[in-house]
């Protein structure tokens, strides 16, 4: 996989996790965290 290190999103992504070695873990946790977050964001967006 090729990651755009110059991308601000990629840099902030590493900053939040605090390490590029967590890339694999974060990718597996992303879908799990997005599921509950998406449900919580739905009512907030409809308001």
From Swiss-Prot:
Induction: By wounding. Residues 1-47 are annotated as: Disordered. Residues 20-40 have a biased composition (Basic and acidic residues). Abundant in radicals and epicotyls of seedlings and higher in the roots than in stems and leaves of mature plants. InterPro entries: Wound_ind. Pfam families: Wound_ind. This is Wound-induced basic protein. It comes from Phaseolus vulgaris (Kidney bean). The lineage of its organism: Eukaryota, Viridiplantae, Streptophyta, Embryophyta, Tracheophyta.
